[in-house]
Amino acid sequence: MAMVRADADRESLGEGLLQERSQWLWSLPTAQPGAEDADDQLVLGEEELQDLEEEAVARHSFSQRIHSRATPLEVSPSGRLYQSIRHSRMEYSRPTMNIRSQIVSYSSSARPLPQQPAPSLTSWTPIAKHLHSHQQSISSQSPKLVRGASQRR
């Protein structure tokens, strides 16, 4: 019993930290063009696909913010700190089923973060399309990724 409780506490702590970092990074004012100490990249998007044959609709909305700023060398050997927050929400629905997926990730590094493409709705819908509505559905939580500045890939 204590083991389950510890895992639940750890999970809620991770969710809280992710939510806290996400809110903080999104609340930062955007860097002014030409500012030497900070740089911002913001990507927002939505897409929708309709399959008339299956009477299905797939929707995807995503947002990503990459923020970098100058920091003391004690904080980052490169003199900069790079932080990224990504949100992606997908939904596939047809008369007999509704599937939702959400991904939130936060990254922080002393090195520039690699550009990651947003998940593609066109690569996700074929998987959902081939599911049969009579299959038993199993509920599970989506994995959440929280990385600290000291972790390496």
Swiss-Prot record:
<feature type="region of interest" description="Disordered">
    <location>
        <begin position="107"/>
        <end position="153"/>
    </location>
</feature>
<dbReference type="GO" id="GO:0046740">
    <property type="term" value="P:transport of virus in host, cell to cell"/>
</dbReference>
<dbReference type="InterPro" id="IPR001964">
    <property type="entry name" value="Luteo_VPG"/>
</dbReference>
<comment type="similarity">
    <text>Belongs to the luteoviruses movement protein family.</text>
</comment>
<comment type="function">
    <text>Transports viral genome to neighboring plant cells directly through plasmosdesmata, without any budding. The movement protein allows efficient cell to cell propagation, by bypassing the host cell wall barrier.</text>
</comment>
<keyword id="KW-0916">Viral movement protein</keyword>
<protein>
    <recommendedName>
        <fullName>Movement protein</fullName>
    </recommendedName>
</protein>
<keyword id="KW-0813">Transport</keyword>
<dbReference type="Pfam" id="PF01659">
    <property type="entry name" value="Luteo_Vpg"/>
</dbReference>
